[in-house]
Amino acid sequence: MLQGFVQIALILAILVATAPLLGRYMARVFLGQSTWLDKIARPLESLIFAGSGITKHPSMGATQYVSAALISNLVMGVFVFLILMFQGSLPLNPTGLAAPSWDLALHTAISFVTNTNQQHYSGETTYTYFSQAGALGFLMFTSAATGIAVAIAFIRGLTGQAIGNFYQDLVLSITRILLPISLVGAILLLVAGVPETLAGPAQVTTLEGATQWIARGPVAHFEIIKELGENGGGFFGINSAHPFENPNNFANLLETVIMMVIPAGLIITYGIMAGNPEQGWLIFWMVFILYGILIAIAAVGEFQGNPLINQILGETQPNLEGKEVRFGWVLTALWAVSTTGTMCGAVNGMHDSLMPPGGFVTLSDLFLQIIWGGQGTGTAYLFVFLILTVFLTGLMVGRTPEFLGRKIEKREIVLASLILLIHPIAILIPTAITLAFPDTLAGISNPGFHGISQVAYEYASAAANNGSGFEGLADNTLWWNLSASFSLIAGRYVPIVALIFLADGMARKQPVPETSGTLHTDTTLFTGITAGAIIILGALTFLPILVLGPVAEAFNLV
């Protein structure tokens, strides 16, 4: 067990060392300061702006920004949907795959354009190289960049600046952050043994003399943006448990760190852009501590194993069901907490096989959305909790709620409440409908408490733009594809609209002079209260489904 926690500590140390560096770099990019990439990136950006007709307008209003984000995402989603439906007539199709069903193609396009990558299919048998590496890979960059752009706009608004130009932020997110890191990361994955080829499946002869076809493809460049952009959709059906996506411990370490580095770095970016690095670090350590607690719960649960099996064996054995031997229980538990905390959604083991503590932790991550949170939007969610904490503490002590020198009033609280309420609506309502008709709709493989967790996880993953699954569901059906699409859209775009209008409203407010009665938000006490508010609000909202799922399952095993 000690060796396992040493492995965890090493990965966390690398994260703590790299996230601030990237955070400072991202702050320089979006503050318009010079960076070492200027000579390479500026000509490319000028070409993109000139070719697309985008002008470097100083800033957009909230309505313009929202319209630009929604319309561009709609166009990209429709474009990719059409590619998927006509993939049989397009190039790079060595296995002769035909088009999927319309509802699966629709769900896939919505899933990738929302940065979720929830997969009701197995990539190597459903989509061509062109569909995966071209169409879906394209959305992996643009959906991640959309999230970063929204986060930066939100940070600008909170700090009293104009929210900016969506198209400019989108392009900068790709050319200055996602592309450079992906290029280096893909080379490292190639060195680690991840394939990158347009050749068809390899024909091999097994030890028994039979002929077998082994799927391969342009995996390395797909894999790195999958993790970096917190996309999570695997080139192969078993995702990062597949040896061609995640062949060894070096690749696993790289992919684990890379999925967390942008959301963790954005917290530092906020502190710099707000002119208050101390507050950025306090928030960073708050999230880090919550993250560490959840890792400990999941890891200990996997180490203790299944009580029923341990009773038969007469000794305690770790839970190795659904895990790759090369990673073991500890790295699988760490990955599970990281991928659900960051809304990446990639998996290196079967979440359906996690013990109840692991199921509790992964569901809690999806419900809270702030450890470390989704690509950009998770950072914004974190500051929504800060705004609500300021409001609540202001009410308790009789002070006018203020955040970063601007009053928190009715409009801000209404928008913040909408952002937080749409999440349970997009999860609990479809979950209730599905469980009301389990035989006709659900396709649940595990009845009872675990079956409830499976259904809730599917919709929580969709609404949180995560994409991982407990699996065990027959989810490539009309019901699952359409109902999950509802959760995908509601969980992505309603919060984005509300976040932008909240930020724009804050930017337009006149700053309030600091007085002796001003509540300081850059203190350890306030940060602790914020952590408490996050846990309490999450517990009040989702405690019933957690009790009916993993908690009840844990008691059932005793």
Curated annotation (Swiss-Prot):
It is found in: Cell inner membrane. Keywords: Cell inner membrane, Cell membrane, Ion transport, Membrane, Potassium, Potassium transport, Transmembrane, Transmembrane helix, Transport. GO terms for molecular function: P-type potassium transmembrane transporter activity; potassium ion binding. It holds the Pfam family KdpA. GO terms for cellular component: plasma membrane. One of its GO terms (biological process) is potassium ion transmembrane transport. Its main location: membrane. It is a multi-pass membrane protein. It comes from the Bacteria. The chain crosses the membrane at residues 2-22, 66-86, 135-155, 177-197, 253-273, 280-300, 327-347, 354-374, 378-398, 413-433, 482-502, 528-548. Part of the high-affinity ATP-driven potassium transport (or Kdp) system, which catalyzes the hydrolysis of ATP coupled with the electrogenic transport of potassium into the cytoplasm. This subunit binds the periplasmic potassium ions and delivers the ions to the membrane domain of KdpB through an intramembrane tunnel. PANTHER family: POTASSIUM-TRANSPORTING ATPASE A CHAIN, POTASSIUM-TRANSPORTING ATPASE POTASSIUM-BINDING SUBUNIT. NCBIfam families: kdpA. The system is composed of three essential subunits: KdpA, KdpB and KdpC. Belongs to the KdpA family. This is Potassium-transporting ATPase potassium-binding subunit. It comes from Synechocystis sp. (strain ATCC 27184 / PCC 6803 / Kazusa).
